[in-house]
């Protein structure tokens, strides 16, 4: 099995864990007394220091392979890519806020169906920004996955949360749709940053990009927390000594200890999502990453039904079938495309070589 295939599988696993587990952890936070918006936004990217460990291993491996007189820098990222990572990170910070705001007022299943729209946005932006080519299988997958989202939308009228006003629901819906639009722009922007960086993008470099991106997004959310009054201590970075957060922990319905368990695992799980999403852009393309996100959304819906007793209507079953069909269609198209490319390469290699004398 080729290393690239292994990386695709690993990143798909990370993406599945983060894409399915992240919204559930945030719903657990809001359902049991969590009231902050910027704080869960902050948790989505604050786990970025975890990326330091694979980067350290990569550095040690590079240094071991070099001769004694040669040196290797710890970070391979050059200024253009570093600046691009910061810009993308700022957008991710605001996207996190939009998504957290929406999830505070709408069920996970409803949020998932709205986020499905990001696939269409990703395809549109990828077409103009990185000249992403569409095959019939890709178009079929997009239509099926988008159709699944539409079916869910038509069956979400009874999904309002308890004690929720119509205004809160509408605002939550709009904010989540905005998150889908912005994320649909972010994925091709990352791919464009790779192409315009002037560097050969390796998986190590993709991880460095991810760490800088998440750090910038975390800073945005940290400023938002300060502005929203989420900190009541002199040194804002001491999360666990924060009077606002500590008070929320004491009032958490599952208990103070489980409150901290929830926020720690929320940070870890969301970091898995970002590593998987950015990794898939490196291994394949932004459109592949977007399709995988959309393909996993019905799984999130089913988990929400199981964990939070959200209603599972017939429309959600139809959406799940359409999503699976779309995913199979896309991957089948990828296999056929690779087979066609290999066949063409084989034909070219078998052409007779003749000497031409002028």
Swiss-Prot record:
GO terms under cellular component: membrane
Keywords: Membrane, Transmembrane, Transmembrane helix, Transport
A Pfam family per the record: PUNUT
GO MF annotations in UniProt: purine nucleobase transmembrane transporter activity; purine nucleoside transmembrane transporter activity
Regulation of its activity: Competitive inhibition of adenine transport by isopentenyladenine, kinetin, benzylaminopurine, trans- and cis-zeatin and trans-zeatin riboside.
Keyword Transmembrane helix included in the entry's annotation: yes
Lipid bilayer topology: Multi-pass membrane protein
The protein's name: Purine permease 2
pH dependence: Optimum pH is 3.0.
Gene3D superfamilies in the record: 1.10.3730.20
Functional summary from the UniProt entry: Mediates adenine transport. May be involved in the uptake of cytokinin analogs.
Family, per entry: Belongs to the purine permeases (TC 2.A.7.14) family.
Cell location: Membrane
InterPro entries: PUP_plant
Domain EamA: 46-154
Annotated TM spans: 6-26, 37-57, 74-94, 110-130, 134-154, 170-190, 209-229, 262-282, 288-308, 312-332
Tissues expressed in: Expressed in the vascular system of leaves. Restricted to the phloem. Expressed in flowers and roots and not detected in stems.
Gene Ontology BP annotations: purine nucleobase transport
